[in-house]
Amino acid sequence: MVKSPCSPVTTGKKRCRAKPQKKDEDTTDKGKLDEGPLDATKEMNGVGKGDSRAACKRPRRAAACSDFKEKSVRLSDKSSVVATNGNKMEEEEMDAVKLTKLGPEVQRPCRKLIDFILHDADGKLQPFEMSEIDDFFITALIMPMDDDLEKDRQKGVRCEGFGRIEDWAISGYDEGTAVVWVSTEVADYECVKPAGNYKSYYDHFYEKAQVCVEVYRKLARSVGGNPNLGLEELLASVVRSINAIKGYSGTLSKDFVISNGEFVYNQLIGLDETANTDDEKFATLPVLLALRDGCKSRVEVSKLQPNISNGSLKINDAECKEVSEDDDEKLARLLQQEEEWKMMKQRGKRGTTSQKNVYIKISEAEIANDYPLPAYYKPSSQEMDEYIFDSEDSFYSDVPVRILNNWALYNADSRLIPLELIPMKAGAENDIVVFGSGFMREDDGSCCSTAESAKLSSSSSSNHQDAGVSIYLSPIKEWVIEFGGSMICITIRTDVAWYKLRQPTKQYAPWCEPVLKTARLSVSIITLLKEQSRASKLSFADVIKKVAEFDKGSPAFVSSNVALVERYIVVHGQIILQQFSDFPDETIRRSAFATGLLMKMEQRRHTKLVMKKKVQVMRGENLNPSATMGPASRRKVMRATTTRLINRIWSDYYTHHFPEDSKDADVNEAKEIDDELEENEDEDAEEEAQIEEENVSKTPPSTRSRKLVSQTCKEIRWEGEAIGKTPSGEALYKCAYVRELRINLGRTVALEDDSGELVMCFVEYMFQKLNGAKMVHGRLLQKGSETVLGNAANERDLFLTNECLEFELEDIKELMSVNLQSLPWGHKYRKENAEADRIERAKAEDRKKKGLPMEYLCKSLYWPEKGAFFSLPHDKLGLGNGFCSSCQQKEPDCDELQILSKNSFIYRNITYNVNDYLYIRPDFFSQEEDRATFKGGRNVGLKPYVVCHLLDVHEPAGSRKIHPASTKISVRRFYRPDDISSAKAYVSDIREVYYSENIVKVPVDMIEGKCEVKKKIDISNSDVPVMVEHEFFCEHFYDPATGALKQLPPNVKLMSVQQKATGALKKNKGKQICESDQVDSDKCTKVSKENRLATLDIFAGCGGLSEGLQQAGVSFTKWAIEYEEPAGEAFTKNHPEAAVFVDNCNVILKAIMDKCGDADDCISTSEAAEQAAKFSQDNIMNLPVPGEVEFINGGPPCQGFSGMNRFNQSPWSKVQCEMILAFLSFAEYFRPRFFLLENVRNFVSFNKGQTFRLTVASLLEMGYQVRFGILEAGTFGVAQSRKRAFIWAAAPGETLPDWPEPMHVFASPELKINLPDGKYYAAAKSTAGGAPFRAITVRDTIGDLPKVENGASKLLLEYGGEPISWFQKKIRGNTIALNDHISKEMNELNLIRCQRIPKRPGCDWHDLPDEKVKLSSGQLVDLIPWCLPNTAKRHNQWKGLYGRLDWEGNFPTSVTDPQPMGKVGMCFHPDQDRIITVRECARSQGFPDNYQFAGNIQSKHRQIGNAVPPPLAFALGRKLKEAVDAKRQ
């Protein structure tokens, strides 16, 4: 054993101590070395002192400069004393050793080295162990063998380039801490502390040395070791011990120990020479031999011999120096170990979480030999763009799942591409674009492996046997492998859908095979690991060996050659890692094989792709080469037809504001991007969480007060006499002078606030305070870019606001040129106004070029708190009478309470009197019940407001401050049927309440508005299932103690509406209810056509929007435009008096403008012009013309609104996006009185909100008043979650319609639109905390319909019973026969699954038993869709797939094709084994039973799924009718 630290065991002897000097080398003695500059091209040799060793190389040193400039400097005595902070420098090692001697030395000198580096003769730093290969030298601070080195650094002597290193050694085995020694001819040196720049080089070797020490201590009996340990036990023990060392950085792995097994073995057998005779010999120790052999086997695996010819390497006919094979291999091995160690340390520093941020890309070069020779894809002549089938509102988290058969993948050059080049993780920043083609059909839940013959799958019913639609895909973003049993299924994702891959094309099959082979191999390895007692029992190397032993007949066989097996597994490693990461068993995911594979992949230095935090759906144009290579698509591409005004607005914007270049983008864009990704139509689980934590209060109306920078100015005076006085007696003036500026009423002035920002104010009136201060009362003006318009606004546009500011005249900095514009309105003035605008823009551009001040335009009042732009109130601006219209309409604090008397009070601007009926929040009476969280039962447990009768007002005692929370009222509680039971609620009128003797005291802050309780004969009735009045009736008495329900006693008198003062109860929740609200709704449908708005419905579909608007009695659809024939046919059936044009709206607009002689104002394609010219004379006669259309409504297709569309060439998806241009062009050309745009909720955030902002900007440019908002259909009386964005526009002089009030409880958060400065606007508050009426349930909606079977196809049926619920009575009306109660037919397997889904709320695929079933074909298949369990974590547990509806819940978002494996998934009837029928879907949307649909069952479902719910349209129509009636009155 090693006893003396100065006598280490030398186990690292170099094979050759010194290389002989060549005859042609220059020799330089010491004296010449120091004389001057040396030739850098010559080798430098030192001469040994008194021995026969060959001369060794000395390192090069910097040449000394001999051309110094001299300057005489006089130093003071003090300055001439120099304090030496550095160490002594010595040229010769011998001198340095002598200077550091502490006393007499009998043995060979031993010293310590700190701040050392090892380098070659050229001064380049070199790894420690490379000294075995070449001559290395040392530069260090040589210290005596002292204990406290840092304290006595001054004792050290610095020596540069000494040595060479003759050998090295390791000691410290007994102590447990490795000590590394190096020896030169002069002395032995203990390596204590490397220099900072050398630490990374030295640490690798030191860790190897520490491994040697730890292995020794685990095996040597003399220090308590056990030589009989097994290899796995030894590895685990060593790794655990080293990782536990205090101060050890990084994480040591078993692989690191194994990879250095031979090194450890060679060091320890060197100790056998000094070992006791009783000790075990390390050279023959089985565990040490196993460690060495494990290392050797790894070396052999890594030797993939390249085809290199024999002989030495020649470059330009010059032969390189021969290097022995042993040295060459050793050098390669050391370099490889160095790289592996660095990778291990990096992983240790990053920790496990950092791996989530990168994706190791598979190298195409490394997998090339596993694939066929290059080939190219030829597109089918029938291929269609997948964007055509894009769901309206699908985003990443809920895109539909489809099947792709007969598929192939290729790049932009149409070259066939391996699937594994695409990242397998969502969000990886990919650097390769891969497209695909194939035959697409909807997923029917059938089980079939990728590349499996279709005949083996569980086929669906006959209507799914077709091959599908031939499509070409947009770029593939990610892919996954799912496996179960013997099945392996590959699924790819584009921005439009997930596609389960079935059989590839014959040409592409060889390109698919390596991926499937690797997937099968991965499954075999997982099976192998599961068979072990511990998954980590088998290391990476062990698994490689076992895979090499697979039978050749195995589907996972790769090769019998271990080296080839490892290469295959590593180069295809991402496929295997993905399957491991998705495996539910954590021990498999964290197995030694998986971590070893990841390390091996990292060692190959592959490209690492950055992982993004969020997956961004970027659906721009489809760049698939098949779009241009194949013949024309079956659906012709046509650019939008536009008017010149719309074309200018949009093209100017995209010319100046490309998304990637926009520097002045809206400050909310970043947030809007996040919103766009988070907004999903099917948000059940997420929204429930939001409802709990979200406050339903909006940003309060802004009342900014700016601190202005005042300046003393003597040149301020009034002109003329006072023209009146303010209400407080202050003198009013018409004109003033500030310096040379003349300030008049109605002018705009600029101020400067304390931040130096210019503020523009419109002068309302000027007055002089009683203290003499000359003041201005003004209204702030905002630049368009500061409004919701953002960068879509014109730089010259200003908007008047309701924010007022009072300031002194002396604060005015300058006058601004602002024109309060008011142009004549109507289609007759279009061209006149357009010409005036052209002249104005040219003038502004000329002023800009000349550097003159900008002249601003102000056309509208911006009111963000109402989400609207209004016409300027010209008749109320700048009157100078001391009154401001903005200040007058400001409402006081909405929570303010004012006690008027013992019998009345005002709260939230509503007056309450004793005997009034009012709403109380339900949470006052009972704690909110726990609501179920299963998909579809979202409204279960939500309560409507409690109807109460105000009996008394209790004023606070004494001088106590009046506060809504402390002021109490006494009320009588009325109960509802749903307070008794859901069964009672189902059979009762939704407006019925029960009288009780329950009298309670309630805080005023629990009040939510007023209502009326009447006799049943006094309440209004309607055939429409929509509540618009706050009316209830009472006929029964309820005793909550006994549960008894009795007829209302005669002595109980309910106030009828006649006993109320007219209009006294017209307010509810702060909003004035118009008299029209109280009229019988039947009268709405009887309004004559002449008194309705003549309406044009564009993108009409089957007519849901028109139906609701006509039911409201406000519109009559005279014209409708629809592209799809079945939808157009359905519209005609239900609106026979309308002229329905089933054609492209671009062609129709062109035909109309040609008819009216305005072809010069029309921008269209030649194709549109050709088709318009082919219109029959009858069609042309029926076309509307400007002046006839009073109302335009519609919902332009929204599939293309996502992505970056930039007015460049693109296919169908771009055309759909441009439909908004055609829609706006209809409005611009016809100039109707009212305009309504409907779209998906995400319309406001698509494209970073650009499309939404440009739409609003276009309407404002036309001169319209505009209001924007988002509404939830479920709050207006349908049993379905459906969020829609709306934009109202009203002509100048018209009343801009307000938003309808949500009337039903529904679990939906406040639907916000983000505004600048962190504010937001919500058109309606959330009703999750209460509403006037309960939610409509699935039972309310379809509980009366007769039972039908799977695949029911009979179009007409008898009802078989009377309607039960209030909703059923309204929706059925006078319909006698039930039509379209037909159901899609499921395949055999899905029908079995449906039958096995329990008939209780919330049940879905999770409730299926884990077993196999035999189909009629004899095939045995899994009852649980095998692909779901392994991917549930990634897809929110696939919640709702194969789900049953809840009788007491609601329908999920209406989809165009209900499928058990579809985007929504919950489509099974609550207690029947089938998919919901067409009529049930129609009722969920609020279509009356007499409404007809057209085409096959798929077309009917599509018409319903794309429609606006008629009850929501009805509620909007009621508000439009109020606006129309207000003008008439």
From Swiss-Prot:
Induction summary: Induced by salt stress, cold stress and drought stress.
Tissue-level expression: Expressed in roots and inflorescences. Expressed in roots, panicles, anthers, pistils, endosperm and imbibed embryos. Expressed in tissues containing actively replicating and dividing cells, such as shoot and root meristems.
Pfam family, one: BAH
SUPFAM superfamilies tied to this protein: S-adenosyl-L-methionine-dependent methyltransferases (SSF53335)
Basic and acidic residues: compositionally biased ranges: 21-35
EC annotation from Swiss-Prot or TrEMBL: 2.1.1.37
Cell location: Nucleus
UniProt domain BAH: residue ranges: 741-873, 910-1049
A GO cellular component entry from the record: nucleus
Entry superkingdom: Eukaryota
Segments of skewed composition (Polar residues): 697-706
Disordered as annotated region, ranges: 1-56, 674-706
Keyword DNA damage attributed: no
InterPro entries, per the entry: BAH_dom (IPR001025), BAH_sf (IPR043151), C5-Methyltransferase (IPR050390), C5_DNA_meth_AS (IPR018117), C5_MeTfrase (IPR001525), C5_meth_CS (IPR031303), Cytosine_MeTrfase1_RFD (IPR022702), DNMT1-like (IPR017198)
Enzyme class: transferase
Lipid biosynthesis recorded as keyword: no
Deletion consequences: Non-viable and shrunk seeds, and embryonic lethality when homozygous.
Name this polypeptide is given: DNA (cytosine-5)-methyltransferase 1B
PROSITE patterns the UniProt entry points to: BAH (PS51038), C5_MTASE_1 (PS00094), C5_MTASE_2 (PS00095), SAM_MT_C5 (PS51679)
Keywords: DNA-binding, Methyltransferase, Nucleus, Repeat, S-adenosyl-L-methionine, Transferase
Catalytic activity entry: a 2'-deoxycytidine in DNA + S-adenosyl-L-methionine = a 5-methyl-2'-deoxycytidine in DNA + S-adenosyl-L-homocysteine + H(+)
Gene Ontology molecular function terms on file: chromatin binding; DNA (cytosine-5-)-methyltransferase activity; DNA binding
Family stated for the protein in its record: Belongs to the class I-like SAM-binding methyltransferase superfamily. C5-methyltransferase family.
Start and end residues of each SAM-dependent MTase C5-type domain: 1093-1527
Entry function: Major CG methylase that methylates chromatin CpG residues and maintains DNA methylation. Plays a major role in genomic imprinting, regulation of embryogenesis and seed viability. Maintains DNA methylation at the FIE1 gene locus in the embryo.
